Amino acid sequence: MKFIIKLFPEITIKSQSVRLRFIKILTGNIRNVLKHYDETLAVVRHWDHIEVRAKDENQREAIRDALTRIPGIHHILEVEDHAYTDMHNIFEQALALYRERLEGKTFCVRVKRRGKHEFSSQDVERYVGGGLNQHIETARVNLTAPQITVHLEIEQDRLLLIKSRNEGIGGYPIGTQEDVLSLISGGFDSGVSSYMLMRRGCRVHYCFFNLGGAAHEIGVKQVAHYLWNRFGSSHRVRFVAIDFDPVVGEILEKVDDGQMGVVLKRMMVRAASKIAERYGVQALVTGEALGQVSSQTLTNLRLIDNASDTLILRPLISHDKEHIIKQARELGTEDFAKTMPEYCGVISKSPTVKAVKAKIEAEEGHFDFSILDRVVSEARNIDIREIAEQTSQEVVEVETVASFVPTDVLLDIRAPDEQDDKPLALDQVEIKSLPFYKLGTQFGDLDQSKTYLLYCERGVMSRLQALYLREQGFSNVKVYRP
């Protein structure tokens, strides 16, 4: 099988040296992502496209899906590569592929050529289009608004019959811009803002301020791992967790109620800046949007920026909440965010919307900054690829099984669309469906006299959720890994 990768248009208008560098990086990214599907896969770069060839037909859909999620790709053409002899042979091959698809439809033919030929692209369009129109009685030509466009590409002596076109996410290849550190909370905003910087070519590392215990950290790890695995797995990234409870406690004790929100954000920026400096990261990323909460007015954002010299990027600054939630839904992070607790918003009862610099600095004068230095020095840094392995160690007390007894219940915790795509079909065991994002609120309603075997495709989510349920006091859970 063969795929033709078309570049994001902004790449094609770069200077020759920059364009070549971007294409080289994108080629490497594609190779890094796809090697997990087919080790014999070949990725070849050209001036205006990238070619992917693979032998394992069983991985066709997986490879196509992975390509649609790699930044830098505008669209993907799945093609059949054949030799041809003349225009009539081109028509015959097009007829064999498109006959059933064109029945009862309007169509046109569009041809792109590379190389020297005795015919023009328009000659092929007219010949093939006329032949299809004659041989498919219910098909009709429509050059302005066809229902189906027959795409053909001719490269020297090869004919590429385009079977399907799939849109990519566009943007720049990851690695073409410098690294950033995303302050991730697991909510709608931070997930979307992280994705937007990945799409713009940045390798996004994650910094999490833990205010809600192990369960909160598990949830945020799920979001970060999901974003990385889905859109950024071509690169290694860090997940840094900072226990911010001591800082919050100091703020609650020493800082005036109305200033708490801004002071907390300034402390987070200071801590994240230290982490960024430690790892050579150039900028911080937040999900802040203008006016969304009290700390996100222009006055307060300026004061938050002043807490550090590190550049702070806010890709969602002009987005409204409805639009952000829609983006989260499209990315697949909405379900995570809906069940993620919000701890920051309850710290102050009457927050100021127009903080005064002198007053903020006076309140911070009461703060013991050695606490901030300590929590930063104790920050836990892991390779995001190790989240699954680390979770396995954390859930060592949760048994992993490959078989079941008739009294067990297999709990499919995958998202509904995943369950529809690959439904479980097992005999001699009861199967229930309860998506992972509903476990926290609905697991307690199940019959607690039974043992539940949590299942997801890769075992990462099931282990994370098993740990979460254990912490909630449920001992009747195991992880099912066939």
UniProtKB/Swiss-Prot annotation:
Pathway assignment: Cofactor biosynthesis; thiamine diphosphate biosynthesis
Domain Rhodanese: 404-482
Catalytic activities: [ThiI sulfur-carrier protein]-S-sulfanyl-L-cysteine + a uridine in tRNA + 2 reduced [2Fe-2S]-[ferredoxin] + ATP + H(+) = [ThiI sulfur-carrier protein]-L-cysteine + a 4-thiouridine in tRNA + 2 oxidized [2Fe-2S]-[ferredoxin] + AMP + diphosphate; [ThiS sulfur-carrier protein]-C-terminal Gly-Gly-AMP + S-sulfanyl-L-cysteinyl-[cysteine desulfurase] + AH2 = [ThiS sulfur-carrier protein]-C-terminal-Gly-aminoethanethioate + L-cysteinyl-[cysteine desulfurase] + A + AMP + 2 H(+)
One annotated GO biological process: thiamine biosynthetic process
EC main group: transferase
Entries under InterPro entries matching the protein: Rhodanese-like_dom, Rhodanese-like_dom_sf, Rossmann-like_a/b/a_fold, ThiI_AANH, ThiI_fer, ThiI_N, THII_Thiazole_biosynth_dom, THUMP_dom
Gene Ontology molecular functions: ATP binding; CCA tRNA nucleotidyltransferase activity; tRNA binding; tRNA-uracil-4 sulfurtransferase activity
Active-site residues, Swiss-Prot/TrEMBL: 456 (cysteine persulfide intermediate)
Residues bound to ATP: 183-184, 265, 287, 296
Superkingdom in the source lineage: Bacteria
Record-level GO cellular component terms: cytosol
Annotated compartments: Cytoplasm
Entry annotated with the keyword Transcription regulation: no
Coarse class of the protein's main subcellular location: cytoplasm
Name of the protein in question: tRNA sulfurtransferase
Originating species: Pectobacterium atrosepticum (strain SCRI 1043 / ATCC BAA-672) (Erwinia carotovora subsp. atroseptica)
